[in-house]
Amino acid sequence: TLFRSAELFNRAAKGVRLTLAGEQFLVDCQAVLAMLEQACNNVRAVESGQKGVLKLGATMYASYSVVPHVAIQHRDTYSDVELHFQEMVPSDLHAALQDGRLDAAISFSETATPGIHSLVLLREPLIAALPANHPQVQSEHFRLESLSDDPFITVPRQSAPMLYDSILHQCLKAGFSPQIGLEASVQQTVMNFVARGVGVALIPASMENAQLRGVVYRRLENPNMVENMLMWSTKNKNPALPGFVNLCRSIRDKLDAAQSGRIND
């Protein structure tokens, strides 16, 4: 016997037979071996990036363009890797990448940062957002310079410098410097102010997907392009990150096609 208090098997003339205690011990041992095998499989899966957690941050604006495509494709490809998503303003995304709170981030393009890799996922044009009662809504041939006397609602430059500069440059191309009436760090807030008639705005085209009542969108001549970029730290050691980056790289063409189709409608 293996235990002083329990008989696991009985010896008889015809051989050895398990006792009831022995049968239970066998079942438990088989379960332990199965758990050990599963634990080894889990370790291999995590190490290879097939299982685990990936922390993704993005601007609220990206939730109307890139993030849904990426999230669906990731779910279908890496079902055992949990995607934890968090919305932040662009300046906070960079800090979270550098201190390890995020594994990857999707935001507007920025100047090169040491230790941060980037990949362009989508390029889309700026469009004008006007209150529904704005006089230019009825204009057959909309021109940006017609808004030169309107207050503009835009993001603060310190929050999204590339987007701010693109908006400013678009107005300068049209022959005027915009009157900044109000600044808001979140694109949805910018849109809400437009809907209330506080001012007008230039926004990335995918924000039209917000379908906000009280806002009318107009295309621009020769619009500046805004880039959605995937960013990640070179110091990040999450095994799930390389697969996520490759997945994002593989769906860039789909994102461009989806955006082109929407703009041309």
Label every model-predicted segment.
Residues 152-174, 238-243, 252-261:
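Secondary-structure junction motif
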Residues 116-126, 130-152, 234, 239-242:
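Flexible hinge/capping segments at coil-to-helix
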Residues 51-114, 182-184:
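Central regulatory/effector-binding core of bacterial HTH transcription factors
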Residues 3-6, 25-47:
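Alpha-helical linker/hinge and terminal dimerization helices associated
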Residues 66, 215-260:
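A late-sequence structural motif
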Residues 3-18:
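A short LG(V/I)-centered, amphipathic sequence patch enriched
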Residues 89-102, 107-108, 157-215:
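Hydrophobic hinge/microswitch elements
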Residues 114-120, 124-125, 136, 188-235:
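Beta-alpha-beta core module
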